[in-house]
Structures are given as C-alpha cells and as structure tokens.
Swiss-Prot record:
Disulfide bonds: none
Keyword rRNA-binding listed: yes
GO biological process, one term: translation
Free-text function comment from the UniProt entry: Binds 16S rRNA, required for the assembly of 30S particles and may also be responsible for determining the conformation of the 16S rRNA at the A site.
Designated name of the protein: Small ribosomal subunit protein uS14
Entry-linked Gene3D superfamilies: 1.10.287.1480
Organism, scientific name: Prochlorococcus marinus (strain NATL2A)
GO cellular component terms, semicolon-separated: cytoplasm; small ribosomal subunit
Length: 100
C-alpha cells in the first residue's frame, strides 16, 4: 500500500490538470502559431507562470486497489501483484492463465 499522502498528492494534481487544461492548451497553441520571437517569449513566460502540477505529464499511473505507483498495467489499472491475484481468483473477466 502506498503512502496516503502520495495518493492524495496525485489526486490533487489530477484536479489541477482538469482546472488548467483549457488555458494551458490555448497557450500552447498560441505558442506554436506565433512567429515573432518576442511574442513567443511572452507566451512562454505565461506558460511558465502556470502551476507546475497542472502539466499532465506529472500525473502518475497508480493501482486503484493499492495505490502503488510502479508495475501498473494500463488496461486494468492494477499493479502486477493485484492483477495476478485477481486473475487467479477469476475476478477479471476474460483473463485466463496461459498454458500450452
């Protein structure tokens, strides 16, 4: 089980990303379309003025059962340990143990 403070921090980041998504996207589009270097510099400063945690790449994929940050399978949202135990118990529909 991950520390509750780290899970809470990640939840806080997700809320910030949602809140600033439109503003961040419009600034990035304006930055890409700007030709004048001074205009680009001004837009870049506005992007830098946004909160650091509103960038989507700062969100960590976490297991929804345990909150572990590593070894998380995107398809299931589970860490490898939980995926294995739930697959063995038959709690994941369509997942069968491989045998040949």
């Amino acid at each position: 089980m991950a520390k509750k403070s780290m899970i809470a921090r990640d939840v806080k980041r997700k809320k910030l990303v949602e809140r600033y998504a439109a503003k961040r996207k419009s600034l990035i589009e304006a930055f890409k379309s700007a030709k004048d270097p001074m205009e680009r510099l001004e837009i870049h400063r506005k992007i830098q003025a946004l909160p650091r945690n509103c960038a989507p790449n700062r969100i960590r994929n976490r297991c929804w059962a345990t909150g572990k940050p590593r070894g998380v399978y995107r398809d299931f949202g589970l860490c490898r340990n939980q995926l294995r135990s739930r697959a063995h118990n038959g709690e994941l529909p369509g997942v069968v143990k491989s045998s040949w």
